[in-house]
């Protein structure tokens, strides 16, 4: 099966699994997805993920979702830059999510990072998604 928007697919899998109160969900692996999952793990939105190699160059990530008092830690996760409409932001124009309580995940020349890291490194890029 061909996936046209791998980041949108990852976000949808996480959102659907948390709505159903699943402990884990799986997704096909890629370097961009791994970078995005690293940011979500470092910011405390997921417990972590494990990589399974199926051979033939195919990998799969099993994502361990995080809950607090029975409620998902991720209240809202939305895709910003889509295949049909890319959204880029300079350092001065980086979005603030929920007045600083959430994060925007960016793909920059220095790698995938949260908005506050991009401000610290004075770099802009493509706004992949917002998490609150």
From Swiss-Prot:
Q: Give the matching SUPFAM superfamilies.
A: Ribosomal protein S8
Any one GO molecular-function label of the UniProt entry: rRNA binding
Q: Which Pfam families match?
A: Ribosomal_S8
Asked if the record carries the keyword Amino-acid biosynthesis, the reply is no
**So which domain of life are we looking at?**
Bacteria
Return one Gene Ontology term, BP aspect: translation
Name the PROSITE patterns on file.
RIBOSOMAL_S8 (PS00053)
Q: Which GO terms describe its cellular component?
A: ribonucleoprotein complex; ribosome
> Could you tell me the keywords of this UniProt record?
Ribonucleoprotein, Ribosomal protein, RNA-binding, rRNA-binding
Q: What is its biological role?
A: One of the primary rRNA binding proteins, it binds directly to 16S rRNA central domain where it helps coordinate assembly of the platform of the 30S subunit.
PANTHER family this protein is in? 40S RIBOSOMAL PROTEIN S15A
Concerning its family, UniProt says: Belongs to the universal ribosomal protein uS8 family.
How would you summarize the oligomeric state and partners of this protein?
Answer: Part of the 30S ribosomal subunit. Contacts proteins S5 and S12.
Q: Tell me which HAMAP family the record gives.
A: Ribosomal_uS8_B
Task: Specify the protein name.
Answer: Small ribosomal subunit protein uS8
Please give the organism.
Answer: Azorhizobium caulinodans (strain ATCC 43989 / DSM 5975 / JCM 20966 / LMG 6465 / NBRC 14845 / NCIMB 13405 / ORS 571)
Per the UniProt record, the lineage of the source organism begins with:
Bacteria, Pseudomonadati, Pseudomonadota, Alphaproteobacteria, Hyphomicrobiales
């Amino acid at each position: 099966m061909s996936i046209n928007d791998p980041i949108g697919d990852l976000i949808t899998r996480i959102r659907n699994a948390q709505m159903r109160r699943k402990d884990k969900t799986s997704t096909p692996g890629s370097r961009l997805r791994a970078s995005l999952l690293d940011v979500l793990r470092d910011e405390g939105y997921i417990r972590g993920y494990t990589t399974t190699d199926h051979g033939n160059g195919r990998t799969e990530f099993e994502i361990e979702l995080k809950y607090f008092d029975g409620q998902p830690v991720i209240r809202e996760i939305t895709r910003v830059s889509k295949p049909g409409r890319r959204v880029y932001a300079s350092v001065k124009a980086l979005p603030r999510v929920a007045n600083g309580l959430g994060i925007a995940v960016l793909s920059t020349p220095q790698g995938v990072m949260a908005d506050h890291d991009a401000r610290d490194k004075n770099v802009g890029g493509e706004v992949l998604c917002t998490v609150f």
